């Protein structure tokens, strides 16, 4: 399946993942792979349902906790649940920058700027050189908190890491 996905043969990869789940209906890895493929192909609604099914079967799957929590936060839905899921994901997999970033983003969406700043600063110390989206979130959080220099630095780092998003970030700088 992963080979098919890498070769961008998504329809076949989705079919293989769905058949694997039929054969092994409790396999967490297969559910996560199917949800990830659905997300990658743009079927966010199906991906969310798949991750919810995964959580029903395996409530401590930190990847699914992160996916569902971040999705809820990103869509401004059920922020209390989003925070609960993301705190749990962080407890299960501490020091994972992408989970800490998701937690920071949920705090931001919930209007808890102090908590958001604390967590996003922690996320960038763990992953300062690779993930532009973490730096972009840092910029958004710092800007909302009125920390203009910090926001500028974060947006500039995001532009360095992902130059194709530079124009959108430049607009946030002004």
Give names to the regions the model predicted.
Residues 1-174:
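Alpha-solenoid helical repeat scaffolds
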């Amino acid at each position: 399946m992963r080979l098919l996905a890498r070769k961008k043969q998504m329809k076949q990869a989705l079919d293989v993942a769905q058949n694997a789940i039929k054969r092994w209906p409790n396999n967490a890895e297969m559910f996560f792979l199917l949800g990830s493929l659905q997300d990658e192909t743009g079927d966010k609604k199906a991906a969310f349902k798949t991750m919810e099914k995964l959580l029903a079967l395996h409530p401590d799957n930190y990847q699914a906790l992160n996916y569902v929590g971040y999705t809820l936060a990103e869509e401004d839905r059920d922020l209390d649940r989003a925070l609960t899921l993301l705190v749990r994901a962080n407890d299960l997999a501490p020091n994972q920058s992408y989970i800490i970033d998701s937690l920071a983003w949920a705090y931001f969406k919930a209007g808890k700027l102090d908590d958001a700043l604390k967590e996003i600063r922690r996320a960038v110390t763990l992953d300062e050189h690779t993930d532009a989206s973490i730096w972009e979130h840092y910029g958004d959080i710092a800007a909302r908190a009125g920390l203009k220099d910090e926001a500028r630095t974060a947006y500039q780092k995001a532009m360095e890491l992902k130059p194709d998003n530079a124009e959108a970030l430049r607009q946030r700088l002004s």
